[in-house]
C-alpha cells in the first residue's frame, strides 16, 4: 500500500542539479531535512533496455492535487514528461525526458530534465543535468512512483553494505559510476527498502 506521506519535491529531486545555487531549493521532505537527493551522472538504461507502454501516456494527478504528471509520446521510445507541483497557491513546472525500462521483475523510469531555467550563459556553465529514477507500478487508473531513498542509500553506503561510486555534496548523493554500476545496484537492492519515497497518482480523463 502506498504511503500517505507527501513525497519531497520531484522538481527538486529530478531537475537541474544546481552545484552553485542548490541551497536555494528548500523543500519539506518526507524523509527529513538530512535526507540527501540521489542523482546519477549516467543514465539508468542502455538503448537495449528501453520499453514502451502506451498506457503510461496521459495525465496523472495526486489525491491532494499537489502533483500532476503528464506523459506524451517522445522520440525513440522516450516519453515527454511535464511535472507540475502546487503548494499553497504557488505552482512550479518542469519538463523531462522519461525512459521506461525493466530490471529484474520491476519497471523503472529514468527521468532527465530538458526544460530551461532563466539564467545567463555564465550561470548555465555551473549547472549540471543528472538522472533520477523511480520504480513504477502501472495500473489501469493509477500509477505508483517509488523514488530512490537518499536516507536509505546514505546509511547503506556508510555501513559499506552498498558498494557504489558516489560523491556527497550540497545535500546530494551524486552517483558517479557507470550505467552498469547503477543497474547492478538496483537489481540487487530494489526490494531492500531502497525505493521508499512514494507518490500515487490517478489517471485524469481527457477534457474536451
Residues covered by each model-derived region:
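N-terminal secretory signal peptides that target proteins for export/translocation
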Residues: 1-8
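Short hydrophobic transmembrane-like helices used for membrane targeting/insertion
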Residues: 10-12
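Bacterial N-terminal signal peptides
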Residues: 14-25
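Calycin-type beta-barrel ligand-binding domains and close structural analogs
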Residues: 30-55, 63-208
Amino acid at each position: 500500500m502506498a504511503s500517505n506521506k507527501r513525497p519531497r519535491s520531484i522538481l527538486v529531486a529530478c531537475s537541474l542539479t544546481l552545484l552553485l545555487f542548490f541551497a536555494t531549493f528548500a523543500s519539506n521532505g518526507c524523509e527529513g531535512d538530512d535526507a540527501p537527493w540521489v542523482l546519477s551522472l549516467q543514465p539508468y538504461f542502455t538503448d537495449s533496455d528501453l520499453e514502451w507502454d502506451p498506457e503510461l501516456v496521459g495525465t496523472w494527478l495526486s489525491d491532494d492535487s499537489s502533483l500532476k504528471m503528464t506523459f506524451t509520446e517522445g522520440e525513440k521510445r522516450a516519453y515527454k514528461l511535464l511535472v507540475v507541483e502546487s503548494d499553497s497557491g504557488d505552482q512550479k513546472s518542469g519538463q523531462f525526458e522519461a525512459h521506461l525500462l525493466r530490471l529484474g521483475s520491476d519497471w523503472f523510469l529514468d527521468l532527465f530534465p530538458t526544460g530551461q531555467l532563466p539564467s545567463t550563459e555564465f550561470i548555465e556553465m555551473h549547472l549540471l543535468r543528472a538522472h533520477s529514477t523511480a520504480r513504477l507500478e502501472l495500473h489501469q487508473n493509477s500509477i505508483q512512483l517509488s523514488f530512490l531513498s537518499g536516507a536509505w542509500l546514505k546509511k547503506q553506503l556508510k555501513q559499506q553494505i552498498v558498494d557504489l561510486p558516489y560523491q556527497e555534496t550540497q545535500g546530494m548523493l551524486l552517483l558517479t559510476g557507470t550505467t552498469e554500476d547503477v543497474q547492478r545496484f538496483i537489481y540487487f537492492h530494489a526490494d531492500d527498502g531502497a525505493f521508499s519515497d512514494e507518490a500515487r497518482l490517478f489517471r485524469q480523463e481527457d477534457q474536451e
